[in-house]
A protein has these predicted regions:
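Mixed-charge, Lys/Arg-enriched low-complexity segments
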Residues: 1-20, 60-83
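Acidic, low-complexity, intrinsically disordered interaction modules
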Residues: 18-71
């Protein structure tokens, strides 16, 4: 499922559908791959990956995107980083 990341005109619709307005301002658009839009949180530097057509959430692991639920995706983005 993983492919090249295409960077072009930002697509904010999946993010706007997933988060409240005050929260999506903290994300940067990084591109799209295989129909999954990639956003990076400005502070945690973690990604929130959302299907452009489905609104489903994904996490990148072992060279591929695996589907996870919304709660897991949000938790991943905001959990403290371990150093």
């Amino acid at each position: 499922m993983s492919g090249a990341i295409e960077v072009g005109e930002p697509d904010w619709k999946p993010l706007e559908g997933a988060l409240s307005r005050e929260n999506y301002a903290d994300f940067m658009y990084m591109g799209v791959t295989s129909g999954i839009v990639l956003y990076k949180h400005r502070d945690t530097r973690r990604y929130l990956n959302i299907g452009s057509e489905t609104g489903r959430f994904y996490r990148y692991a072992d060279g591929d995107y695996i589907e996870i639920n919304r709660e897991q995706a949000i938790e991943h983005v905001y959990e403290p980083r371990q150093i």
